[in-house]
Design a protein with these regions (language model features):
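Conserved N-terminal Rossmann-fold NAD(P) cofactor-binding segment
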Residues: 3-73, 77-92, 135-136
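Rossmann-like NAD(P)(H) cofactor-binding subdomain of soluble oxidoreductases
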Residues: 82-138
Length: 138
């Protein structure tokens, strides 16, 4: 999920917002699912295997609360730039976007959901995230 609707449209299209060799194939199968497929092993066509159909299980959306409420695992990955003003400007990490995202997760996550923080953050940030999550789940 992302708050940027244009980015989500790209993830839901054939033209992903990032280029990584082979990524479109992986995303397409997970996002769109597949039909059952019969493949032949070896060169002599003697051994055939049927790969079962696959339901879609990768979704891109701007609806944060709905997505988080349905998720068993939530990966939080937001931009964490260097602060540009105030105490620590030019050196400290700006955690405003991270704290906002974690607050949204805390308000919507179901009990027992696993929250994984994937942004580049300073030591001790996990403690802050835990506090936000515990306050939001009350």
């Amino acid at each position: 999920m992302d708050l940027d609707e244009a980015r989500i449209r790209k993830w839901n299209s054939r033209h992903l917002p990032v280029h990584e060799p082979g990524l479109i194939d992986v995303v397409r199968v997970a996002r769109d699912g597949t039909k059952a497929t019969e493949i032949t092993l070896g060169n002599d066509d003697s051994e055939k295997v049927v790969l079962p159909s696959r339901e879609p299980n990768l979704f891109f959306s701007t609806n944060v609360s709905e997505c988080v409420a349905a998720a068993d695992v939530v990966l939080v990955s937001v931009n964490t730039p260097t602060k540009s003003q105030g105490i620590g400007a030019g050196a400290a990490t700006n955690l405003v976007a991270l704290e906002s995202a974690v607050t949204s997760v805390a308000q919507a996550a179901k009990p027992g959901a696993i929250v994984v923080e994937k942004s580049t953050v300073p030591c001790g940030t996990a403690r802050t995230i835990r506090e936000i999550l515990s306050l939001g789940s009350q």
